[in-house]
Amino acid sequence: RNAAEAAQVVAAARAQGVLAMEAMWTRFLPQTDVIGQLLADGVLGEVTTVLADHGQSFEPDPQGRLFNPALAGGALLDLGIYPISFASFVLGAPDTVVATGSITDTGVDAQVSLTLATGSAQACLNTTLLARTPTRASISGSAGYLELSGPFYGPARLSLDTTAGRVVRDPDPITGHHGLCFEAAHLAQLVADGATESPLLPLDETVRILATIDEIRRQLGVVYPGE
């Protein structure tokens, strides 16, 4: 639920020489590899802006995991982790974090809008438990932009438009949670190789992302029991 607890898991895994990996399935989808190649090749030019949202509408349940602070409830850890992890993949560690939002009667984050700045680039992200949102994402740069259809965190359609007039629309992806097969296959390969960490989502990045969420919660005033 926070960076300190994640760091304890990482330290224990490294001390025992065993495999540990965050189950962030988006990182293991083929589209993520394509996005990484486009960024590495400079197809978008200098990246300036990342946009992403993830909102779903839930009936408030004070005892349910989404609204109960004792269960680390709130939009951030359940939904917001996807746009935040996406921004981390594209821009790396943020230099500054600015967040605003609303809190439920039970004391967890209901809705959060945030800006993560890395150098001159910014990620503008939103997450909410109060409404269903398009769950789309985009990356814009000096040479063009890339759009991901909703929900962007699963198998999504990519659309590339460049200032030079290049337009690419990829075919329909596999649907829904069938995309979890790529995460499972990657984990199986790591086990077969005797690896202790995934190169696609290093453990230090997992801890760093949670540290970002910790800072967002600090700004909002969300504290879990025992912290």
Regions found by a protein language model. Name each.
Residues 6, 31-32, 83-84, 155-157, ...:
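A general structural signal for well-ordered alpha-helical segments in protein cores
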Residues 189-227:
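C-terminal helix-rich "cap/oligomerization" subdomain common to oxidoreductases
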Residues 26-98:
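Predominantly a Rossmann-like dinucleotide-binding segment in NAD(P)-dependent oxidoreductases
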